Amino acid sequence: MKKLTKIGASALAGSLVAMSAHAEVSVSGGASIAIGSTHDADATYYYQNDSITFTYSGETDGGLTVTTSLEIDGDYSGSTGGDFDSQSIKIASDGMGTVTYSAHGGSSVMGGWDDVMPTAYEESFALTKNSADGSTSGNLTIAGIGGNGLWRYDSPSVGGISFHAAYQNAGQTGSVNSYSDMGIKIVPEMIDGLEIGYATGEYDESATVLGVDVSTMYAKYTYGSFTVGYQQSEDDGPSTATTDESDSWGVSYAVNDEFSISYGQHTYDDGSLTPDQESSGFSASYTMGGTTISAAFNETENVRGVAANDEDSYEIALSFAF
């Protein structure tokens, strides 16, 4: 990361000069190339991903830290080009926590906690797509809402306990109702390495399925080089057919500071479908001097609840951070 720190007078616009003694501009970036396949009948794909993030942070006379960031994030896989992404502003106070408004690319609490199982690279359900519909649909999962115009609050940790909440109005969700969720994370000070979390929210699944309660709970424990975790999630809709459940577990092992491996499993029970979707995956990553080589090899049985629709997927990526 390259940083430019301004002390005293600034060459920027006069409206920023008053904050220049306490402000910092930073630019960070990354680039990656990858090869992979999303299902058995899929041809090998290649893609390139580039990301540059501009961050401006300053402290007001009242002690608030204000940070605004804009990410230029694009990938090219033969059909898509670059784009702007992740535009946000954060207002933080040591005693009161952080309020974030994401004009683009925001994450709700459920969206960020949809799968927090330990992994060296990708989740066990990731990458795989359904060959039956032309590889346009990925594996079924339970998650919250994310996207544009999203507010989020993250409290400071008090005794290892922190509170989190998110809100997105109906104009942004595109549904009849707004979206909101909240969660609590516990990292008990008396048990080193343990983390427990619970989050719940409500959203509209479609124009006819309204008021779906979504929730997740998880526990992770790190001991030495090993981390293990277990997670359960639920979409509780107005009928049995619109009520879905999932559970997942994972274990990772840090061989050393540079090399990590992991294995995980994920099961999704769709209330409207008979066979459960069952996924498993192995990941590995090796980092040296800002360069990372990552790989994931996943397989899913009954993709999207279709019996005997079994698919394998993989991805190998080379990424650079600067």
Language model: regions and residue ranges:
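Outer-membrane beta-barrel proteins
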Residues: 1-322
